[in-house]
Amino acid sequence: MTQLAREFGAYVIGTGRAADRQTVLDFDAQEFVDLDNDALEDVGEVDLVFDVIGGDIGKRSAGLIRAGGTLVSIVGPSGARPAGGLAVDFVVESDRAQLSQIVQRVRDGRLRTNIGNIAILDDAVAALNSTERRNGKTIIRVRP
C-alpha cells in the first residue's frame, strides 16, 4: 500500500515496532513512527489512515485525521470515527483490470513484495498458524 500511495503522490508515514523500521522505510515510507517508543499523536494531522492494526492504535490513529480525511480499516469495523472525516471498511472486490495493473507494476519493478516464507500446500496450516514472528508474507505453493 505504501508503494502505491507514493506512486500517486502521497507523503507516507509508516508505523510499527522498532524492528520494522528499515523494512517500512525500504518500502517507501518517508517517515517512521515506532509505536512502542514514539508518540503517535506527534505526527499531527493526516488526510488518510490505512489501519491494519485496529484496537487502541486504530482509535488513536483516527484522532489524527483532519476534517474531510478518511480512515480505512482492513481489520473490520474499528468503532473509531474521525471527527469531521469518513471511516470505511476495506473490501476487496475482484477486478481483472486492476489485478492486471498490479501484476504489471510488479513486473516493472514499481511494486515490490515482502515474502517471508514459502510453504507447500500440505504444510499450509502449520505455516499460517505459526506463532513465530516472521518478516514478510507467507506464500502457499499450490503446485510443486
Regions of interest found by a model, annotated:
Residues 1-144:
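Terminal helix/beta-alpha structural elements that buttress the NAD(P)+-binding lobe
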